[in-house]
């Protein structure tokens, strides 16, 4: 927070810094977000008080739009500067969640919205239309279900300063011994899927998100399918824990 008379100049400084940063990231291969969910968007350049208010609105008045925004902005992390800004924001978010525990159920329901990446006959579910018709979307169908599950469970456990999905599952495995195997398998699966996407991106000089299954070997397809069991297991855990049936 800054004095009111300094707010406009301070915001302008950080927007300019963000635009320089996002341009540099784009230059080295990070695609611009088509929905403009980037630091260079003035909408996301706010004071600590404004961010506290923003998260409070998302938690207390959830909607399809706020669920999408929550999935993005609950994964913030400290980069540089005053660590107390992050601590105070986290304190505010966790206090609001304590007062509104039903929001965990909202997040969990959102986390299981994507079905298993395999169909009834264990075939890959592929895109049915658009530019990527018949391609497998490894981000939406395999990575995001794990990311979303780890996020809601970590928030429910009040975990701080762990914003990578594999690390979250590893910490959850320590906290919940009865579900240790599920969490460890999820951590392994996430790292394997991320490695697979990276390899595909390097091979095809793209993001690696959409995969042409015909180009994969039988062994690669089997490896992918083994990872999918963890998605089913963690979604089943969420369904039971948050009474989603």
Label each PLM-derived region with a short phrase:
Residues 1-3, 199:
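Generic low-polarity alpha-helical segments
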Residues 3-72, 81-96, 103:
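Conserved catalytic core of two-metal-ion nucleotidyltransferases
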Residues 75-77:
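Small-residue (G/S/T/A) turn/hinge positions that recur once per unit in extracellular repeat modules
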Residues 80-245:
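Conserved nucleotidyltransferase catalytic core and NTase-mimicking acidic/glycine-rich helix/loop elements
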